[in-house]
Regions:
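A short beta-loop-alpha structural element at the N-terminal edge
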Residues: 1-16, 145-158
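Hydrophobic residues on conserved beta-strands that form the core of alpha/beta folds
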Residues: 3, 70, 136, 148, ...
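Conserved GNAT-fold acetyl-CoA-binding loop/helix
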Residues: 16-42, 150-178
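Conserved beta-strand in the GNAT
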Residues: 52, 58-74, 183, 189-206
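A short, internal acetyl-CoA/4′-phosphopantetheine-binding micro-motif in the GNAT/acyltransferase core
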Residues: 69-80, 103-104, 205-212
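Conserved acetyl-CoA-binding loop-helix of GNAT-fold acetyltransferases
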Residues: 81-94, 112, 116, 213-227
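Conserved GNAT acetyl-CoA-binding A-motif
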Residues: 94-106, 228-235
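C-terminal "cap" of GNAT-fold acetyltransferases
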Residues: 100, 104-111, 116-117, 123-147, ...
């Protein structure tokens, strides 16, 4: 799972993989659909972080993600059934803390695969994101290894974390009481926190030193964006 080529070559190969995989698994699509979706797939391959699986010098599978959402997962039809897709999903769950994915309802193999990986249906739409009549299932991981919890008790119990981001306790006291506070738990341990005031400003965000550089800050921001999406236009 490494990059051996320049980005343009990687994108071209991933688009090829997408088309080969779709032709093998999406029998509900017509030829015009593949032509329609190809530019969108190329755009996603260009802009999203990609995890690549190589066999020798050849890319045979890839996963694209955006924050904590798995946006793409495609495996060369010749390499299906070898556990490559499972490996990519497990990496995404563990290393980028992925928790959501959208899948075509008519792609029964994919629906069953994600169910085995621990995802469950959160909602359904009759059309896809382009308005085409292909129902989409939006899935969420049932038991992710980490979770965000809103603090309803003593917020100062997490002062050691708050002071990592804002070393002046008097300053923390100015905003803490009237703000929302959340803690990030991993395996039963609090490893991070975030404080958001009544105007939607993030006043404090911290992750324990031993968990820094592991995308937990991104996870917190992704959670906050979802939590406040109907209340604030931006944070």
């Amino acid at each position: 799972m490494k990059e051996k080529r320049n980005r343009a070559e990687i994108v071209e190969r991933c688009v090829e993989l997408w088309e080969a995989s779709v032709r093998a698994t999406h029998d509900f699509l017509v030829e015009g659909d593949i032509e329609f979706y190809r530019p969108f797939v190329r755009e996603n391959c260009e802009k999203l972080p990609l995890l690549l699986h190589y066999e020798g010098d050849e890319i045979v599978a890839f996963l694209g993600y955006d924050m904590t959402s798995i946006e793409m997962l495609f495996v060369d039809p010749d390499y299906r059934g070898k556990g490559i897709g499972r490996d990519l999903i497990e990496w995404a769950i563990e290393d980028v803390h992925a928790e959501t994915v959208a899948v075509n309802e008519q792609n029964g193999q994919a629906v069953s695969f994600y169910a085995r990986m621990g995802f469950e249906v959160e909602r359904r739409t009759e059309t896809d994101g382009c308005g085409k009549p292909y129902p989409i299932l939006y899935l969420r991981l049932k038991n992710p290894p980490q979770r965000m919890v809103k603090v309803t008790g003593d917020k100062k119990a997490y002062l050691h974390l708050l002071l990592d981001a804002d070393p002046c306790e008097a300053m923390v006291d100015r905003y803490l009481e009237e703000s929302d506070m959340f803690v990030l738990e991993r395996d039963g341990k609090v490893i991070g926190e975030a404080v958001v005031d009544e105007k939607g400003e993030i006043k404090n965000l911290a992750v324990l030193p031993e968990y820094q550089g592991k995308l937990y800050g991104m996870y917190i921001l992704s959670f906050l964006a979802g939590y406040y999406k109907d209340r604030f236009s931006c944070l």
